Amino acid sequence: MNINVKLSKNFTTQYNRMQEKYGEEFAELNGFSDKQLSFTDFIDNFIDTETVADASIDSSANVGNKDMRTLLNEMPKSHRKLLAFNKIYYELNKKYGFQCANEWLDAEWSRALYLHDADTSTYKPYCFAYTLERLAKEGLFFLKGFNYEPARHLTTFVDFVKEFVSYTSNLSSGACGLPDLIPYMYYFWSRDVESGYYTKDPTTYALQNIQRLIYAVNQPAVRDSIQSAFTNVNFFDTPYLIALFGGKEFPDGKPMIDELDGIMDFQKMFLEGMSDIRSKNMFTFPVSSISFIYKDGHFEDEEFAKWAIRHNMKWSDSNLFTSDSVTSLSNCCRLKSNIRDLGFFSSIGGTALRVGSVKVSTINLARIAYESKDEQDYLCRLRDRVELDLKVLDTVRHIIARDCEKGLLPNYDDGLIDLASQYNTIGIIGVYETMKAFGYTKLDEEGNTYYTSKADEFGRRIFEVINMTKEQFILDKNYKVSIEQIPGESAAGKLQKADEYLFPDKVVKDLPLYGNQFIPLGIKTTMKERIRIASLFDSYCNGGSIAHLNLDAPFNSFEQAWDMTNYIASQGLTYFAFNTKIQACKHNHGFYGSICPVCGEPVATEYTRIVGFYTPVRTWSRARKQEFEMREWENVNK
């Protein structure tokens, strides 16, 4: 029996050429091998593999349960990706010509470029940070044919947030940021307490609802029936709170600025609630990001900064964002937005919260190093690759816009997402491998890796070329483009494997996959050098880059944690996380050590970050697990 799939004639011709040119290995890397396209073969392979990540053509550490739901979701991915590539090729050909379409398909197939979430790339956007203002004022306004009304109490509002997260998560492929969740939860909580609706302990009431929300977003079938909802919650120091919410009002018309102290206290309650829950039930979401103003050598809101750093000592579960201006903001596990550059900054507060990305397409920087004769050749090739990447992203954006016009993405019609507030994102990976290939790294007598001065300068030139090329490209466009150092959950291994096939004598294979840090976590170096390099290149990544600073154990003292955080901020590193290994028993209690203090059971798995948020190592792919075993961990308590 033959099943007809109608594809563009030109695309079919080029697709067949790619299969012939690159062979079975690359077909499998792309998810287009016979066994991946065959549903029966896929089912057999899925059953035999240890984890979903090893069976998927586009794995995610957030998908941990291997069951019928994940089987049914993963099975058609190759076909969805094939249809998406057909659409992109067709539209690229129309807008930029036949040669450009062919160049893209070759670059994507050979893994010079990597389009993330490719199977949904023409169907839904990547990520967005949503304001909950309308939800707080009107209720479930996004549900069609539903007579909605506003929440009157905290419990109802939390239920509304759960529905909101489920709705938005299923209409995007990436994160759902909730930067103003805390002020609105505080509003409903304080009204319930002050009105006498809730007459028992107010703290208990708050913590119960915080727990309800955390358990809901970690329910493993909220998104696409196979994974929990990738959510991020923001916490701010006083200068940020004033800047972002100073011009905003609660649903009853009361200015948020009048409740600044209450909002600050509720932030602390939420963070403490998250911390307590981890001991009982280790979880992944929401990702917590704490933003501080650090200026002239000190934290402006030192009281909150000290409280937050002390709080973070237990689990190191918050990502820390420092800036000398409120025009920069973190909305995601690594997403960093320069609000002024992106045109979304409002001095009276509020509008800066709604920002996101349409799609991410990554440039394999290591590949260019293997192709190049020297630095100048590298930079010329890089410029061409960036231009091609920008054309692809522009085309995908056009397709998403058409989907909106056809009413296929109601989250845009509802006003939840504004396409004008989303940028296209150039992903990068392979900075370390590029420097190693050029001979721009060195070892000290203790085996620590350092970047040479040539690496520092070459890195600057690489980022300058990327930035100048994208700025030139968008001169006649009505949107912005950002640069992001990607997590590379799935991409890092596939790109390295492709380069190993094509450049077996040149490929840098210090680790089983390419690093998602400027110095990968499996490469031995000093904490100071890791911070120095991240500080040097961090500012170029206006779409996100987070430095992971691996600790073999939590800080012993607040003074150590405080001094280290101040040092990092003083070096100009804006976004970072102290990363630990959190053990979990079979009952999912979080702890440090070999035996669970709650139930006495031994370690069943460990939680740590790939990028941005903690996930159980047992759900990772084989290559990721190998990389985890090779990671270096700093002893900060010696």
Feature locations, PLM:
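Conserved catalytic cores of very large enzyme subunits
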Residues: N2-A420, T441, G447-T452, D456-P597, ...
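Glycine-centered flexibility sites
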Residues: G427-G430, G543, G612, A623
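Contiguous, well-ordered alpha-helical segments that form the cores/surfaces of helical PPI scaffolds
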Residues: P183, N424-A437, R609
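Core of folded catalytic or high-affinity ligand/protein-binding domains
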Residues: L419-A420, N424-I428, V617, K625
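Metallocofactor- and cofactor-centric catalytic cores in central/energy metabolism, strongly enriched
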Residues: T204-L207, Q211, Y215, A437, ...
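Short amphipathic alpha-helical leader/targeting segments
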Residues: G247, D403, F438, E445, ...
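Intrinsic, low-complexity terminal and presequence regions
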Residues: K581-K638
